[in-house]
From Swiss-Prot:
Pathway: Cofactor biosynthesis; 7,8-dihydroneopterin triphosphate biosynthesis; 7,8-dihydroneopterin triphosphate from GTP: step 1/1
Name by which UniProt lists this protein: GTP cyclohydrolase 1
One BP annotation, GO: tetrahydrofolate biosynthetic process
Oligomeric form and interacting partners: Homomer.
Annotated Zn(2+) binding sites: 75, 78, 146
Keyword line: GTP-binding, Hydrolase, Metal-binding, Nucleotide-binding, One-carbon metabolism, Zinc
PROSITE patterns found in the cross-reference section: GTP_CYCLOHYDROL_1_1 (PS00859)
Gene Ontology molecular-function annotations: GTP binding; GTP cyclohydrolase I activity; zinc ion binding
Species whose genome carries this gene: Campylobacter lari (strain RM2100 / D67 / ATCC BAA-1060)
Length: 190
């Protein structure tokens, strides 16, 4: 598989008019393979296993929020990066998940070819399904290189998406609390 991938990179370099044999490009096919292997490593990870290994009994029934989780992903349309921050909240139902597992869950889905809308929904659905939360709220704010580097070339534009499930969707009070918390003392730095 690696050999086939590397040959494809060499072919691409030739198509754009480069010489894959010049010094600066000799190791590029291997580097690109390793980069893509890492950036798409989420396909080899099971969200259920990550979350179920860290579920703990709890009487807590108040909102748990992990804010400003940085992520990087590749747009499935152009294979260009998009990156930003994810805010994830849930209301437990007799079980809480280890806090470090929420950023790991984000990484599992971000390290797949993606669109931001789908990434937002996948995080919310995984928490609802595998943690058994009463509700989940996910907001992603991201910059897309397919918008900034090509096409309309609008630097520094930000795309925001949200996915609300359970009590976050049904209760205006819960929704308001979530959006207030993620916007309080907000400092967006990319």
């Amino acid at each position: 598989m690696q050999e086939k991938f590397e040959q494809s990179v060499k072919n691409m370099l030739e198509i754009i008019g480069e010489n894959p044999q010049r010094e600066g490009l000799l190791k590029t096919p291997t580097r690109v393979f390793k980069a893509f292997e890492f950036l798409n490593s989420g396909y080899k990870q099971d969200p259920k296993q990550i979350l179920n290994d860290a579920l703990f009994e709890s009487s807590n029934n108040e909102m748990v929020l992990v804010r400003d989780i940085e992520f990087y992903s590749l747009c499935e349309h152009h294979l260009l990066p998009f990156f930003g921050r994810v805010h994830v909240a849930y209301i437990p139902d007799k079980k809480v998940v280890g806090l470090s597992k929420i950023p790991r869950l984000v990484e599992v889905f971000a390290r797949r070819l993606q669109i931001q809308e789908q990434l937002t929904e996948q995080i919310a659905e995984a928490l609802m399904e595998h943690v058994g939360a009463k509700g989940v709220g996910v907001v992603i704010e991201a910059r897309h290189m397919c918008v900034e580097m090509r096409g309309v070339q609008k630097a520094n534009s930000t795309t925001s998406t949200s996915a609300l499930r359970g009590s976050f969707l049904k209760s205006e009070k819960t929704r308001k609390e979530f959006f207030t918390l993620i916007n309080s003392a907000k400092q967006v730095r990319f």
